[in-house]
């Protein structure tokens, strides 16, 4: 089973507003960047999309260490998801889970992999987190119709 390191981030200019997501996949000394965006989104949706797209890109089962600066994503997948599934996608307070379609897609994308979900503090000097932050922000800027920066 291949060991893959993944770094993800999402960005939104306003919440909701133009959004971008990015992922960096690293395997055996090689890197692949993924990025995309939506004209109207939220930061949480973009964080979810970054993880989803990274996992869906992998064509075979992998051992993954996935770094995210989103507690929403990390806690959602590692702590809250079992209860949501048990309660038919309702929160502990019986409300519908927000972004359900993305959570279901993420849940499906995790099934063939072994994933260690790691939280990294955003905007704190981690070079890989900073890299995906710039990529995601540039996608959000492009969705707004602006010029991206490096």
UniProtKB/Swiss-Prot annotation:
Cellular compartments annotated: Cytoplasm
Q: Which residues form the RNase H type-1 domain?
A: 1-141
Co-factor binding comment = Binds 1 Mg(2+) ion per subunit. May bind a second metal ion at a regulatory site, or after substrate binding.
Cofactor(s) listed: Mg(2+)
BP terms from Gene Ontology: DNA replication, removal of RNA primer
Provide the E.C. number(s) assigned to this enzyme.
3.1.26.4
**Which residues take part in binding Mg(2+) 1?**
9, 47, 69
GO MF terms here are: magnesium ion binding; nucleic acid binding; RNA-DNA hybrid ribonuclease activity
As its record notes, the protein acts as a catalyst of: Endonucleolytic cleavage to 5'-phosphomonoester
Which residues of this UniProt protein bind Mg(2+) 2?
A: 9, 133
Main subcellular location of this protein, as a coarse class: cytoplasm
Alphabetic keyword roster:
Cytoplasm, Endonuclease, Hydrolase, Magnesium, Metal-binding, Nuclease
Pfam families with a match to the protein in the record: RNase_H
Q: Is the keyword Cytoplasm assigned to this protein?
A: yes
The record ties this protein, via InterPro entries, to: RNase_H (IPR050092), RNaseH-like_sf (IPR012337), RNaseH_domain (IPR002156), RNaseH_sf (IPR036397), RNaseHI (IPR022892)
GO cellular component terms attached to this protein's record: cytoplasm
> Its biological function?
Endonuclease that specifically degrades the RNA of RNA-DNA hybrids.
Q: Family, per the entry?
A: Belongs to the RNase H family.
- Oligomeric state and partners? Monomer.
This chain belongs to the protein called Ribonuclease H
- Species source reads Xanthomonas axonopodis pv. citri (strain 306)
Which gene is this protein's source?
rnhA
């Amino acid at each position: 089973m291949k060991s893959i390191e993944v770094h993800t981030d999402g960005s939104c200019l306003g919440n909701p507003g133009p959004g971008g997501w990015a992922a960096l996949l690293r395997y055996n000394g090689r890197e692949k960047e993924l990025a995309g965006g939506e004209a109207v989104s939220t930061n949480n949706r973009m964080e979810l999309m970054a993880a989803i797209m990274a996992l869906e890109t992998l064509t075979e089962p992998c051992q993954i260490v996935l770094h995210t600066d989103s507690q929403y994503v990390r806690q959602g997948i590692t702590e809250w998801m079992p209860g949501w599934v048990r309660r038919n996608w309702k929160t502990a307070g019986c409300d519908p889970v927000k972004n359900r379609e993305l959570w279901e897609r993420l849940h499906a994308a995790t099934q063939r992999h072994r994933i260690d979900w790691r939280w990294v503090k955003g905007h704190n000097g981690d070079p890989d987190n900073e890299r995906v932050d710039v990529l995601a922000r540039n996608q959000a800027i492009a969705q707004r119709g602006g010029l991206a920066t490096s």
